């Protein structure tokens, strides 16, 4: 095993031994942020039990990809993603898949490392059926339009100040104490004109 890999494994093991009860915490992102900051975004089913590699302290889940929304270029010549990798311990942000339904589809947004898909507790991994119509539309086509120019800017405390005209102020967490508010479920931060972004509703228009 390479020296760096051995060192990384030792550090992970040490963290687990000295702080077994310390939970991994993170602030859930707006779905558009999750899309834009991820290398690969797919819809997939978890079809296998976790397999733990005790040398690297990582585990992998076998998945069946049903749709890819982002990552075609990053994958290169690879035609499919068969496994998703995560730290083996939740104390170091390892993802633990709870659902036993192997036919249930999940939206998975993660990072590619050496051609392998990695996720953590902080990754955006949610049942596809739990997403709103607007969120599904966003992951399918719309969020990508805002990645290069626009930024969802989370408001942590009042007063909130935007740092740029290309930022959209996200207040769901502050006002509702939840990342599942109206802005998360129905809005996308999209370019309106050069140098300007604004919230745009993705809900279907009523006749």
UniProtKB/Swiss-Prot annotation:
Post-translational modification: The activity of TIMP1 is dependent on the presence of disulfide bonds.
Broad class of the protein's primary localization: secreted
Domain NTR residues, every copy: 24-147
A biological process term (GO) from this entry: regulation of integrin-mediated signaling pathway
Disulfide cysteine pairs (residue numbers): 24-93, 26-122, 36-147, 150-197, 155-160, 168-189
Glycan attachment positions: 53, 101
Keyword terms of this UniProt record: Disulfide bond, Glycoprotein, Growth factor, Metal-binding, Metalloenzyme inhibitor, Metalloprotease inhibitor, Phosphoprotein, Protease inhibitor, Secreted, Signal, Zinc
Protein name per its UniProtKB record: Metalloproteinase inhibitor 1
Organism from which the protein derives: Oryctolagus cuniculus (Rabbit)
């Amino acid at each position: 095993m390479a020296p760096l890999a051995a060192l990384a494994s030792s550090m992970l093991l040490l963290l687990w031994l000295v702080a077994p009860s310390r939970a991994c915490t993170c602030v859930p992102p707006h779905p558009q942020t999750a899309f834009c900051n991820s290398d690969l975004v797919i819809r997939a089913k978890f079809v296998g039990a976790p397999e733990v590699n005790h040398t690297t302290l990582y585990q992998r889940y076998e998945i069946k990809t049903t749709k890819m929304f982002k990552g075609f270029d990053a994958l290169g010549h690879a035609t499919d993603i068969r496994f998703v990798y995560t730290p083996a311990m939740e104390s170091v942000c390892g993802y633990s898949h709870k659902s036993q339904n192997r036919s249930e589809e999940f939206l998975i947004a993660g990072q590619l490392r050496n051609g392998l898909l990695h996720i953590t507790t902080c990754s955006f991994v949610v049942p596809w059926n739990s997403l709103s119509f607007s969120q599904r539309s966003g992951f399918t086509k719309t969020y990508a339009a805002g990645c290069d120019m626009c930024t969802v800017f989370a408001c942590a405390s009042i007063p909130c100040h935007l740092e740029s005209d290309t930022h959209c102020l996200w207040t769901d967490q502050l006002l509702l104490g939840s990342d599942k508010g109206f802005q998360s479920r129905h809005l996308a931060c999209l370019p309106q004109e050069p140098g300007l972004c604004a919230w745009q509703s993705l809900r279907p228009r009523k006749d």
